[in-house]
Amino acid sequence: SGSCTVRTCWRQLAPFTEMGRSLKQRYDVAVKVLSMTNEAAGERTIARSRRRPREQRGQRRPKVSDGALTPRGIDLVYVEDSPSYCRASRYSPGTANRSCQKGRNCDSICCGRGYNTRVSSVQKPCQCQV
């Protein structure tokens, strides 16, 4: 017959590129936070440590006692700044002396230090099948 007795609904993820774009937008406006403990009550609160991006300044946000804004549930937050991967450290060898492809990634890999170019000729056997 033409009647429906059961209706099935399901959730589906957005396309991968759309999810990546959304995550990148949130990353670009991520909020650095400070964790403060109320010694008397033993309660912990989280407060932003930097100003809100221009596009979010008109929106109302809850405040913690010292006047700092609390991040929303959808905000990406971080506690420490990322290390510079340009300089060598105990966590990273840095990017000095790395090979890059001119016009593609040298500006980012070389971290503004500039780079030397080299032209080379390479001969390889052709791997031909006769």
Swiss-Prot record:
Family assignment from sequence similarity: Belongs to the Wnt family.
Cysteines joined through disulfide linkages: C100-C111
Bias (Basic residues): 47-62
Native source organism of the sequence: Eptatretus stoutii (Pacific hagfish)
Gene Ontology MF: a single term: cytokine activity
Domain of life: Eukaryota
KW Glycoprotein (keyword) present: yes
A single GO cellular-component term on record: extracellular space
Residues the record marks as carrying a glycan: N97
Ranges in a coiled coil: none
Name of this chain's protein: Protein Wnt-9
GO biological process, one term: cell fate commitment
Pfam families the record matches: wnt
Stretches for region Disordered: 41-69
Lineage, top ranks: Eukaryota, Metazoa, Chordata, Craniata, Vertebrata
Cited function: Ligand for members of the frizzled family of seven transmembrane receptors. Probable developmental protein. May be a signaling molecule which affects the development of discrete regions of tissues. Is likely to signal over only few cell diameters.
Post-translational modification: Palmitoleoylation is required for efficient binding to frizzled receptors. Depalmitoleoylation leads to Wnt signaling pathway inhibition.
Sorted UniProt keywords: Developmental protein, Disulfide bond, Extracellular matrix, Glycoprotein, Lipoprotein, Secreted, Wnt signaling pathway
Lipidation (O-palmitoleoyl serine): S1
Coarse class of the protein's main subcellular location: secreted
Subcellular location: Secreted, Extracellular space, Extracellular matrix
